[in-house]
């Protein structure tokens, strides 16, 4: 079976989610620079992600989830995914608690980073998704894998 693995930011969504969160909460300057350097391969994804979550983790998780629940999506792609959920999944470094409302609309399996949430804030990252692990999992199961993404960390 062919498995289509989609990056979330800029692939399923029409905009990058971390800069959207940062702008909404007025912490965009630092996040924009980290995101830009990550997309262009200047800062390793893991290092950048930890730094971005440190900044954004102080913000209310429920408000971030509500904000991302309203993010603009590529409708045709979402229709494809929702028509073929058994062949599709989304792999994103975003925290599962942040993208849960997107997963309500894009109805396939989501692979996300995880964190401990206390008092509606991220207290600690517990796992950071490595997208290549999702690819390797499906290859090991004998699937043909097609990964669709737009950033350096999607290669």
Residue ranges with predicted function:
Residues 72-73, 126-130:
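Short secondary-structure boundary/capping elements
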Residues 2-112, 118:
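Alpha-helical substrate-recognition element adjacent to the catalytic core
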Residues 6, 112-113, 140, 149:
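Intrinsically disordered, low-complexity regions enriched in small/polar residues
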């Amino acid at each position: 079976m062919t498995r289509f693995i989609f990056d979330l930011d800029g692939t399923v969504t029409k905009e990058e989610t971390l800069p959207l969160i940062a702008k909404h909460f007025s912490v965009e300057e630092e996040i924009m620079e980290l995101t830009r350097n990550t997309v262009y391969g200047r800062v390793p994804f893991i290092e950048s992600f930890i730094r971005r979550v440190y900044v954004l983790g102080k913000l209310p998780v429920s408000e971030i989830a509500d904000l991302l629940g309203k993010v603009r999506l590529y409708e045709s792609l979402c229709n494809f995914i929702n028509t073929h959920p058994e062949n599709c999944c989304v792999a994103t470094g975003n925290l599962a608690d942040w993208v849960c409302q997107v997963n309500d609309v894009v109805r396939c399996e989501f692979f996300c980073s995880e964190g401990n949430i206390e008092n509606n804030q991220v207290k600690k990252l517990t796992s950071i998704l490595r997208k290549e692990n999702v690819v390797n999992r499906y290859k090991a199961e004998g699937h043909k894998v097609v990964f669709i993404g737009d950033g350096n960390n999607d290669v």
